[in-house]
A protein has these predicted regions:
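Short beta-alpha connecting loops at secondary-structure transitions
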Residues: 6-14, 224-231
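Active-site/ligand-binding-proximal alpha/beta "capping" segment
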Residues: 7-29
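Flexible, low-complexity linker and terminal segments
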Residues: 24, 29-262
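Flexible glycine/proline-rich, aromatic-decorated loop/lid segments
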Residues: 1-7, 217
Length: 262
């Protein structure tokens, strides 16, 4: 979400199981075309090591999204404004090899044609145009591709990635506990209303509770408990159920480290 040289828009899509991964790969490519920016398809070790039997019908090819926004072809060779202003942040483009058009590319700030510029007014305009892509994506991407509220509860668990399967199964053993699974991590979805008045818990495969930090930053809602595991082993059902029961019963610390498999 934050890595890279300078600040630029990118989308981060985290798959929760193998079927998600198959479909999300297609979505990531479609979004990269649509928004003309980087899309990170985030997987993890446990998904990569998992085997699963799925019906053939599940592996469907998704219909193409919005047609690529192409620049008009020129009658004779000529430059065109590859980085022209656009209300939604996405400028029309010509694929490489398009007859009659050409443009310049540079890693420095550039004008509408692609020439390097240090003009501060133009710099602001180009930066604001690029970053507008995030808001456009947040508004256009269907909510079901951003997050899924599998069940609501006074204790609301948030997770991403391969914790999905374990936490969905854990719900069968827990009363009053809900699960909100996040798929689009950036731009962060507008989930603050779903968190209102809940005891919030994140369950994650990392040391610090990265999702908890992100949720607090983007929603201004405090995450009350962080359940983390970082020993290279997946979170198991019994671990998840035991720790979430402790949260529900009010006897859990703010940070819970899972160590099964050591």
């Amino acid at each position: 979400i934050r890595g890279g040289h300078g600040e630029y828009p990118r989308l981060v899509l985290a798959s929760g199981d193998l079927l998600d991964a198959f479909l999300d790969a297609q979505k990531a490519l479609a979004w990269a075309w649509r928004y003309q920016t980087v899309v990170v398809h985030l997987l993890d070790k446990f998904l990569a090591s998992t085997g699963q039997v799925l019906p053939k019908e599940a592996f469907r090819v998704l219909p193409p999204g919005e047609e690529k926004r192409l620049a008009p072809k020129a009658g004779k060779p000529a430059p065109y404004a590859r980085y022209a202003p656009a209300k939604d942040g996405v400028s029309p483009f010509a694929p490489l090899g398009t007859q009659g058009v050409f443009y310049w590319m540079t890693s420095d700030e550039h004008d509408f044609l692609g020439h390097i510029t240090e003009d501060p007014v133009l710099r602001e305009a180009q930066m604001e145009k690029r970053m507008q892509k995030l808001q456009t994506a947040r508004e256009e991407i269907p909510k079901e591709d951003q997050y899924t509220l599998y069940r609501d509860g006074e204790v609301l668990v948030l997770g991403f990635g391969s914790v999905k399967g374990t936490l969905l199964e854990a719900l069968d053993h827990l009363e009053g506990v809900g699960y909100l699974h996040l798929r689009l991590l950036w731009p962060f979805p507008e989930i603050a209303p779903l968190l209102e008045g809940k005891t919030l818990v994140t369950v994650e495969h990392n040391y610090s509770g990265q999702l908890a930090d992100l949720v607090q930053q983007e929603t201004l809602k405090r995450v009350h408990h962080r359940v983390v595991k970082y020993n290279g082993r997946p979170i198991t059902l019994d671990e998840a159920v035991a720790r979430l029961k402790a949260v529900k019963e009010g006897r859990a610390p703010k940070r819970l480290v899972l160590r099964k498999g050591v």
